[in-house]
Amino acid sequence: MLMPKRVKYRKQQRGTVRGMTKGASLVHFGDWGLKAMESSWITAQQIEACRLSMVRTLKRTGNIWINIFPDKPITSKGIGTRQGKGKGDVEGWVAVVKKGRVMFEIGGVDEATAKRALEYAASKLPIRTKIVQRYEIGGEL
């Protein structure tokens, strides 16, 4: 699973996920991308499931870029634990994904294969997504 090697502080507050993404709203590396249409947390397990489904669909051809990384720790208290006694232990890691962010990119394969791989990846995610294509500055593909 993806997780940071080390962090300055083990635990974080939950925060809010509002607004649009500040960057990464265009496809930069590949030819096709999977864009988030809602804001949400994406867990490390969900990212890995998407990666595996894309790798199996592409069958060792083309390239995959993952543009999100789970760097936010999520804590939870044990079942049957009473209130108080401090914050719970770190249970997993999530990536904060805002609306409009391109999460995954694929390049080096034909259009049908890329779309099929991104559709499989989108089915593993808890948010609505859209498949987007890369546009050059001149307006041509």
From Swiss-Prot:
GO terms for cellular component: cytosolic large ribosomal subunit. GO terms for molecular function: rRNA binding; structural constituent of ribosome; tRNA binding. InterPro entries: Ribosomal_uL16, Ribosomal_uL16_bact-type, Ribosomal_uL16_dom, Ribosomal_uL16_sf. GO terms for biological process: translation. Keywords: Ribonucleoprotein, Ribosomal protein, RNA-binding, rRNA-binding, tRNA-binding. SUPFAM superfamilies: Ribosomal protein L16p/L10e. Pfam families: Ribosomal_L16. Part of the 50S ribosomal subunit. This is Large ribosomal subunit protein uL16. It comes from Petrotoga mobilis (strain DSM 10674 / SJ95). The lineage of its organism: Bacteria, Thermotogati, Thermotogota, Thermotogae, Petrotogales.
